[in-house]
Structure formats: structure tokens, C-alpha cells
């Protein structure tokens, strides 16, 4: 078990987070598919800024799965708000044409899914790794 620490705290807080682009548009499709690495780099950089470790992540055509370790000093909702808000600004800065499809400041949909991860972390990690393949099979 991976135990992290803060000044007076030992912690192991893992969360499975799923969020989607506005209107559930297939962003990781066609021309934007080449820019998946760019979106992944943006999300990774923003996580590092908040000391959040990405255990596993997958960007599917119409949603994103992330298994992350969030320190207890940071609430899940504030982290997801930060991640979606800042990544929107950075994505629109690099891909200005998307502003017309999504509106000026709304790349991601309003909500998200979050689940705590306990002893089943390996199973969730496998699920995220296989998610892209499963999505392609159903399309």
C-alpha cells in the first residue's frame, strides 16, 4: 500500500474521476485525435501543480477517466473545478477553433463522476486501461 505524508498526516486517498466534454462531443476523434497527447499533457501538468498523482488515465473519444491520488489538504470538488477550468483555458488557447463549437469558456460539461478507491484499486486501474478498447467495440 502506498502511503503518502504531509506534515502531521499519513494518507492514501485515491479517486476514480470521470468527466466529459460539453454535449459529450467526441473530441478525441478525427483531427483532434492527434492532439490527445496535448490534452493529456495539460491534465498532467495541472495535476502536478496541485501535487496530485495520476495513477492511471485514459482519454476516450467522449470522456476522460482518471485514477488519482489527491492529498487530504485539497477537496475533490475544488481539484476537479481547478482541473476542468484551467484545462479549458489552456485547450482554447492552443485550439482556438474549438471556442466556436463549445462556447467561449465551456469545454467540459458541468458535472463529473467521482468514486473513492479502496482495496479495489488494481481492478479500477485495469478498467481504465481497457476503457478505450471497450468504447471502440461498442461504437
Predicted regions and their residues:
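Charge-rich, low-complexity N-terminal segments
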Residues: 1-139
Amino acid at each position: 500500500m502506498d502511503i503518502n505524508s504531509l506534515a502531521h498526516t499519513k494518507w492514501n486517498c485515491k479517486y476514480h474521476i470521470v468527466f466529459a466534454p460539453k454535449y459529450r462531443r467526441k473530441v478525441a476523434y478525427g483531427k483532434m485525435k492527434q492532439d490527445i497527447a496535448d490534452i493529456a499533457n495539460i491534465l498532467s501538468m495541472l495535476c502536478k501543480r496541485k501535487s496530485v498523482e495520476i495513477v492511471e488515465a485514459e482519454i476516450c473519444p467522449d470522456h476522460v477517466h482518471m485514477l488519482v491520488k489527491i492529498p487530504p489538504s485539497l477537496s475533490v470538488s475544488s481539484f476537479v473545478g481547478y482541473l476542468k477550468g484551467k484545462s479549458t483555458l489552456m485547450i482554447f488557447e492552443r485550439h482556438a477553433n474549438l471556442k466556436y463549437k463549445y462556447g467561449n469558456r465551456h469545454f467540459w460539461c458541468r458535472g463529473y463522476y467521482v468514486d473513492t478507491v479502496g482495496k479495489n484499486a488494481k481492478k479500477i486501474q485495469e478498467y481504465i486501461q481497457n476503457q478505450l478498447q471497450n468504447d471502440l467495440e461498442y461504437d
